[in-house]
A protein has these predicted regions:
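A glycine- and Lys/Arg-enriched "phosphate-lid" helix/loop adjacent to the NTP-binding pocket
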Residues: 103-153, 188
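Conserved beta-strand scaffold positions in the cores of enzyme catalytic domains, especially
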Residues: 32-34, 108-110, 159-163
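Glycine-rich phosphate-binding loop used to anchor ATP phosphates in small-molecule kinases
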Residues: 59-108, 112-113
């Protein structure tokens, strides 16, 4: 979607099963371009743990993320609203991608998708059965999920974000509010 306001870039902080893909698809229904590194990994390398060994994911993902960042920059510079369907587990990752968005003239918005271990595991264990055919259903165990949680750093109070309540309208309202704030800021210059 090409916009009359500076484009929005929605970045998400959340573990597997937290609802990132569901939210990103809801935003695409509103005209957002969706970029998903996991889908690109699947296109390039196949099924995680089947077509390439489990331990190689970070190495294979690095160039994918670099290419997605280039695509993000191009989409935003073209005036399109974009949602990046990725977990952004650390403040450093979130800051880096937020800077890419801001440098491209976009208004970045971080959305935190919090969920309990039980909620995450219930969703992930259901998705595991589809891992061979669905790039958004990477197979992993409950121990993997616990290990991932130990590496995930939720956004702190000093890291601006919207806490996702399960309703995409909340995110849309936050985008509209940040867009209005940016318009007022631009008008005052």
């Amino acid at each position: 979607m090409t916009t009359t306001h500076p484009p929005f870039c929605v970045l998400m902080a959340g573990l597997p099963g937290s609802g990132k893909t569901t939210l990103s698809r809801a935003l695409t229904a509103r005209g957002f371009v969706r970029l998903c590194p996991d889908e690109e990994m699947y296109r390039r390398h196949g099924v995680y743990g089947v077509d390439f060994p489990r331990g190689t994911f970070p190495t294979l993902e690095r160039p994918v993320l670099e290419d997605v960042a280039v695509d993000l920059r191009e989409q935003l510079k073209a005036g399109r609203d974009v949602v990046v369907d990725h977990g952004f587990w650390t403040p450093e990752d979130r800051a880096r991608w937020s800077a890419v968005a801001a440098d491209a003239g976009a208004t970045p918005l971080l959305v935190y998708l919090a969920a309990s271990h039980n909620e995450l595991w219930e969703r992930v264990s259901k998705r595991n059965e589809f891992h061979a055919d669905d790039p958004n259903s990477i197979y992993f165990s409950e121990n993997d999920l616990q290990r991932y949680r130990s590496r995930f750093v939720p956004p702190a109070v000093d890291e601006p974000h919207v806490l996702y309540d399960g309703d995409p309208v909340t995110v849309i309202a936050a985008l509209e509010a940040s867009g209005r704030a940016r318009s007022v800021e631009d008008d005052s210059r």
